[in-house]
Amino acid sequence: MKTYRSESLFAEARSLFPGGVNSPVRAFRAVGGAPRFIARGEGAFLVDVDGNRYIDYVLSWGPLILGHAHPNVVAAIAEQAAHGTSFGAPTELESELARLITQAMPSVEMVRFVSSGTEAAMSALRLARAATRRDKVIKFAGCYHGHFDGFLVQAGSGVATLGLPDSPGVTAATAASTLTAPYNDLDAVESLLKANPGEVAAIAVEPVAGNMGLVLPQPGFLEGLRRLADEHGALLIFDEVMTGFRVGYGGAQGKYGITPDLTCLGKVIGGGLPAAAYGGRRDLMELIAPAGPVYQAGTLSGNPLAMAAGAATLRAIRAPGVFEQLERAAAMLCSGFEHAAAEADIALRTAYAGSMWGFFFTDEPVVDYVSAKKSDTQRYAQFFHAMLERGIYLAPAQFEASFVSLAHSDALIQETIAAAADALRSIQNAARKG
């Protein structure tokens, strides 16, 4: 596989951007080698600048649930671009996308659009603090809520990949207001609430954790968080930036039947363009300026290009049978990977929820960040490169979720499973030879 052009561009990029990239995980630091520079996307495929073609399971880290360059989304963007790209004034498109969201998620009675998941999470926490007149927040080790200081404590995603427990630049005072519990551990949450009586504004959680690899909520965990939040006067924030319109049309809250007070959204709702949102109970959202005193603003919030792309995407995925098809594809991948690993005598655990899926090189159940960290990251790096050579583009880091789209046909899923079987056999044979 030729990679000269990618390697050349990466060498130049290192003189232009920190680490050569504009988001850390793209640098291939966790797996080694030079990242592929992408020329275009086509349905389920990426094509790099050297002409190599890959079946893509990153999908821009989640937004592209329809696949790359879907005709409906491309047409919506082109139509709006011809009329203008941004106005700094209200548009009908904002209301159209907001209606689609509020209809899909009854807990979201009002919504405010922003431009990134980080903005959504930081704004939701500011609102929770104002509404409760409390300062502290409980989050979960390995969960990632963007690079806002208040959440950048024992975070997942690139923070976990780079092995950073916290980020320099986060003040001690800020970190002290962030309390951390193990994912799926209700006893730990209850202990924190009791140790900080009347001080916790919110419990913030990824209802399906996707930033330490994919970790599912254990039965009763989300219900328990709802109960504990109610008992202690805290708000429950679901960070559905990743899971919203990914694990089901109604997000994780619809899939698991839990009603949060506030919800953060992103990724899919922008259709591949920068868009995110936070929303929830009307009485809470009416505290946001200009209706109320809690300030938040953004130059490109609700920009018409992203609104058009997002609305086109949500209209496409609300069709009957869409999420059954997506979950079936994720289930096929997990089953196929498990079978291939067993045949190669390699320990591997998989999980999926809706169109999200993931795997760990471990023989132990993965229920939290501690157990996720037991995965063999060196083997993951070997597998990643073996799959890349076979035309499969996986996340270049163990501690990230993978995704499927409507463009991933059964034939492509089977091709991926066959590649995985061949890659795992190759890895095991090399290990046996020493």
From Swiss-Prot:
InterPro entries (UniProt xref): 4pyrrol_synth_GluAld_NH2Trfase (IPR004639), Aminotrans_3 (IPR005814), Aminotrans_3_PPA_site (IPR049704), PyrdxlP-dep_Trfase (IPR015424), PyrdxlP-dep_Trfase_major (IPR015421), PyrdxlP-dep_Trfase_small (IPR015422)
Record pathway: Porphyrin-containing compound metabolism; protoporphyrin-IX biosynthesis; 5-aminolevulinate from L-glutamyl-tRNA(Glu): step 2/2; Porphyrin-containing compound metabolism; chlorophyll biosynthesis
Entry's transmembrane regions: none
Cofactor dependency: pyridoxal 5'-phosphate
Residues that bear N6-(pyridoxal phosphate)lysine: 267
Isomerase in keyword set: yes
One GO BP annotation of this record: chlorophyll biosynthetic process
Keywords: Chlorophyll biosynthesis, Cytoplasm, Isomerase, Porphyrin biosynthesis, Pyridoxal phosphate
Top EC group: isomerase
One function term, GO molecular function aspect: transaminase activity
Catalytic activity: (S)-4-amino-5-oxopentanoate = 5-aminolevulinate
PROSITE patterns in the record: AA_TRANSFER_CLASS_3
GO cellular component: cytoplasm
Localization in the cell: Cytoplasm
Self-association and partners: Homodimer.
HAMAP family, alphabetized: HemL_aminotrans_3
Protein name as it appears in the record: Glutamate-1-semialdehyde 2,1-aminomutase
Organism, as annotated: Roseiflexus castenholzii (strain DSM 13941 / HLO8)
